[in-house]
């Protein structure tokens, strides 16, 4: 069962073809170092193309901005993920600025390219295999990422005046 907010909210029953019946390995814990700025708030131009990072879609992330609800990072991805990943803390939005690859998840596979947005709810097991090095903007949100209520009916379907429709979304 995958659920964002427990058994009394929206959930998916997921059946594994090869059930993960035991823990194979617990990796090292690597703390994300978030440094609070001491300067007065002002406009900034963050030159993200000059950020030096490398690794997979998780290890190459460099946090840029954060608050109590989210962390915005930039990643220069030059390696495929060796193991599947599950974020139990946050929903993730990945914007593929450059590059090509494939997202593999327990819901299926999807080819990804420059200009794509990926919304990955917390609890989903996923990994990205890189075909062409990627530049990714990653947003981790501790609250669910969903369409605004004003664009949905009571059943969650997008309304006619929504800025996009289900037809413009790729489902896996």
Segments the model singles out, each with a brief description of its role:
Residues 145-168:
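Glycine- and charge-enriched low-complexity intrinsically disordered segments
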Residues 170-172:
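Conserved small/polar residues in nucleotide/adenosyl-binding loops
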């Amino acid at each position: 069962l995958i659920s964002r907010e427990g058994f009394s909210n929206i959930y998916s029953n997921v059946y594994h073809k090869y059930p993960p019946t035991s823990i194979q390995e617990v990796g090292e814990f690597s703390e994300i170092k978030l440094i609070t700025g001491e300067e007065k708030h002002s406009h900034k131009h963050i030159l993200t193309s000059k950020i030096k990072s490398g690794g997979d879609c998780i290890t190459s992330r460099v946090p840029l901005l954060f608050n109590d609800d989210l962390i915005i990072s930039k990643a220069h991805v030059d390696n495929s993920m060796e193991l599947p990943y599950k974020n139990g803390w946050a929903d993730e939005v990945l914007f593929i600025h450059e590059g090509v690859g494939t997202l593999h998840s327990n819901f299926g596979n999807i080819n990804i390219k420059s200009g794509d947005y990926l919304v990955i709810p917390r609890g989903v097991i996923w990994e990205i295999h890189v075909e062409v090095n990627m530049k990714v903007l990653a947003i981790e949100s501790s609250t669910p990422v969903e369409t605004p209520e004003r664009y949905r009916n009571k059943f969650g379907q997008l309304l006619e005046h929504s800025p996009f429709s289900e037809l413009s979304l790729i489902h896996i």
